[in-house]
């Protein structure tokens, strides 16, 4: 198993130009600039609470709306996670966390299985948080799941303030990802699967 679990992804389309660097064994240091302020705020949560060092730079067609940038950042970040995990040797594989933020409580459970699936249950009453379309929260996670190959369940236990709910979601996600991607010393160099492999299908 490589001692450096980090990766860099560059993704350029006619709509966006994105670069992502991640170090899974970092200290929660981040430099993030996507042109979508609320998305930046949520990505900082992933870095800070997951203890992932994260650099993201995105230039997109936000003069139209934030959809392409939001989705493509999710794709690039998911690919970066998958690449940094490599064969996924020695990882804990499963992660879960309950995160509260005032009246909001969100549960995230995930499996770095190589089997992309999203179950998403956030009830966001506000159509926007600042200028950010709340429909884009689900779109971000769809993109991340499909490119990273994880199974992800997001459940809102309670909450009324949309900002609190979304931020609790990202905090729970970051802690669950931290748990799942950490090395289990008892596994050493083995892949945590009875099949002997975990691949992004």
From Swiss-Prot:
Its main location: cytoplasm. The gene is hisB. The keyword Cytoplasm applies. The keyword Calcium does not apply. This is Imidazoleglycerol-phosphate dehydratase. One of its GO terms (biological process) is L-histidine biosynthetic process. Pathway: Amino-acid biosynthesis; L-histidine biosynthesis; L-histidine from 5-phospho-alpha-D-ribose 1-diphosphate: step 6/9. It comes from the Bacteria. InterPro entries: IGPD_sf, ImidazoleglycerolP_deHydtase, ImidazoleglycerP_deHydtase_CS, Ribosomal_Su5_D2-typ_SF. It comes from Prochlorococcus marinus (strain MIT 9215). Its EC number is 4.2.1.19. GO terms for molecular function: imidazoleglycerol-phosphate dehydratase activity. It is an enzyme of class 4 (lyase). GO terms for cellular component: cytoplasm.
């Amino acid at each position: 198993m490589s001692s450096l679990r980090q990766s860099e992804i560059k993704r350029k389309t006619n709509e966006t130009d994105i670069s992502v660097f991640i170090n899974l064994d970092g200290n929660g240091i981040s430099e993030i600039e996507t042109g979508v302020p609320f998305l930046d705020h949520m990505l900082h949560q992933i870095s800070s609470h997951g203890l992932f060092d994260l650099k993201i730079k995105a230039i997109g067609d936000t003069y139209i709306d934030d959809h392409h940038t939001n989705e493509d950042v999710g794709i690039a970040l998911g690919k970066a996670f998958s690449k940094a995990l490599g064969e996924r040797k020695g990882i804990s594989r499963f992660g879960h966390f309950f995160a509260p933020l005032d009246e909001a409580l969100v549960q995230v459970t995930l499996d770095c299985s190589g089997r992309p699936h999203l179950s998403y249950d956030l009830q966001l009453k506000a159509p926007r948080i600042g200028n950010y379309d709340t429909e884009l929260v689900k779109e971000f996670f769809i993109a991340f799941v499909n490119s990273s190959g994880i199974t992800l369940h997001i459940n809102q236990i309670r909450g009324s303030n949309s900002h609190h709910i979304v931020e609790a979601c990202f905090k729970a996600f970051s802690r669950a990802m931290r748990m799942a991607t950490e090395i289990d010393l008892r596994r050493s160099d083995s892949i945590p699967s009875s099949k002997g492999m975990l691949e992004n299908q």
